[in-house]
């Protein structure tokens, strides 16, 4: 078999196939052709990736990439590809009034695979600082459903930022929350809920959710957390996770707390997905990128295989793209991440300026996106 690209000598970690071993990986025409234990093929280009970790292309389940239209958004290709990410889910930067523009200006033009959640607010996050749902007139559940029907496979779900200063307190907050739930049900998709300082408790939210719905910022601090007054994970949340409710990190500028994460993980409450909530306010710290966020979970005691699973296989399942994304199975799209694991002493900062010193850090050396190689360093040049 004549390959277009052959990666040799790397350690393949692919949780979708229970793989963690040195393999060669061959690519033909943008598709993974083979995973073999010995390089018996010729290739137009061969790269020795010994010492690197080969994973399915990382999937960031929470970022904001509606650049130039939403002030906090960032450039998908400049940040995602450099951070080892091949697929980005934009978490509600656009609503029903501007999702068509988001698709035209971003989804259809960038190299990164970009999908989008449709914000319950018709204007998305264009004026996020003012609270996009403080005026009830901006809530557009019918428009959300129409948008998802108009852009199948690109508009993949519903987003609401369920903080009291965004959706309102008391009954107003509940009304907006329930409109978002209804939009998800009516569109036959799923709902991502940003939890901030919410007008309801997490246990009060849970009865309205169904398997596949997602609570993001699950390790935030503040008044609304996954821990009850006894510093225990709410039993309702443990039951919800077993039922199929998704818990996502969404690190962000204000939504990851070392103490909450340490306590919850010590009690066996492991999130489904690792994501960044990357945007202008955290791009240069404390988030930086996906590998840095993943490294924080290595420090919390999770295994490399688990961290990669939470960044590839599980997000693909959330998106309904398991077997297509988040895997290195032959015949699938050649979306691949090359990671390097460094040993040393590294500062890891949460969203509350708390620093932990970790001994292992991941960085992205490069990616393959649809068979095209992008390198971030001279290591493989």
Model-derived features with residue positions:
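His/Asp/Glu-enriched, well-ordered alpha-helical/loop segment
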Residues: 259-342
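Metal-associated gating/positioning segment near the N- to mid-region
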Residues: 41, 49-109
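C-terminal cap of metal-dependent C-N hydrolases
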Residues: 10, 333-381
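Histidine-rich, glycine-flanked metal-binding segment
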Residues: 1-55
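Active-site core of metal-dependent hydrolases
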Residues: 164-284
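Hydrophobic faces of well-ordered beta-strands that scaffold small-molecule active sites
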Residues: 59-63, 88-90, 114-118, 156-160, ...
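Metal-cofactor-binding active-site regions of metalloenzymes
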Residues: 83-89, 93-94, 109-136, 159-162, ...
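Short, acidic/polar
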Residues: 69-77, 137-148, 199-205
């Amino acid at each position: 078999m004549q390959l277009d690209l052959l990666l040799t000598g790397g350690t393949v970690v692919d949780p979708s196939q229970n793989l963690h071993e040195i393999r060669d990986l061959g690519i033909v025409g943008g598709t993974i052709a083979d995973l073999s234990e010995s390089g018996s093929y010729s290739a137009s280009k061969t790269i020795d990736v010994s010492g690197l970790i080969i994973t399915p292309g990382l999937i960031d389940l929470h970022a904001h990439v509606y650049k130039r239209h939403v002030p906090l958004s960032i450039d998908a290709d400049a940040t995602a590809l450099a951070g080892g990410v091949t697929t980005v889910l934009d978490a509600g930067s656009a609503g029903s009034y501007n999702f068509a523009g988001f698709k035209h200006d971003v989804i259809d033009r960038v190299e990164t695979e970009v999908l989008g959640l449709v914000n319950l607010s018709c204007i998305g996050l264009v004026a996020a600082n003012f609270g996009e749902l403080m005026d009830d007139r901006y809530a557009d559940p019918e428009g959300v459903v129409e948008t998802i029907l108009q852009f199948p496979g690109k508009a993949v779900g519903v987003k609401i930022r369920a903080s009291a200063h965004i959706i309102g307190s008391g009954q107003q907050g509940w009304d907006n929350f329930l409109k978002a739930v209804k939009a998800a049900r009516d569109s036959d998709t799923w709902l991502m809920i940003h939890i901030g300082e919410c007008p309801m408790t997490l246990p009060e939210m849970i009865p309205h959710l169904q398997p596949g719905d997602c609570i993001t910022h699950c390790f935030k601090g503040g008044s609304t957390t996954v821990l009850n007054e006894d510093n225990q994970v709410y039993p309702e949340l443990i039951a919800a996770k077993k039922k199929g409710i998704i818990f996502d990190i969404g690190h962000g500028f204000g939504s990851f707390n070392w103490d909450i994460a340490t306590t919850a993980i010590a009690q066996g409450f492991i999130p489904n997905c690792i994501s960044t909530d990357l945007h202008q306010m955290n791009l240069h710290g404390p988030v930086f990128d996906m590998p840095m966020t993943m490294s924080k979970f290595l420090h919390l005691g999770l295994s490399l295989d688990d961290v990669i699973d939470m960044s590839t296989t599980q997000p693909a399942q959330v998106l309904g793209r398991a077997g297509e994304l988040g895997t290195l199975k032959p015949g699938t799209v050649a979306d691949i991440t090359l990671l390097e694991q460094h040993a040393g002493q590294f500062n890891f900062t949460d969203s509350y300026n708390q620093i932990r010193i970790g001994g292992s850090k991941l960085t992205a050396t490069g990616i393959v996106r649809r068979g095209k190689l992008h390198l971030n360093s001279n290591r493989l040049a």
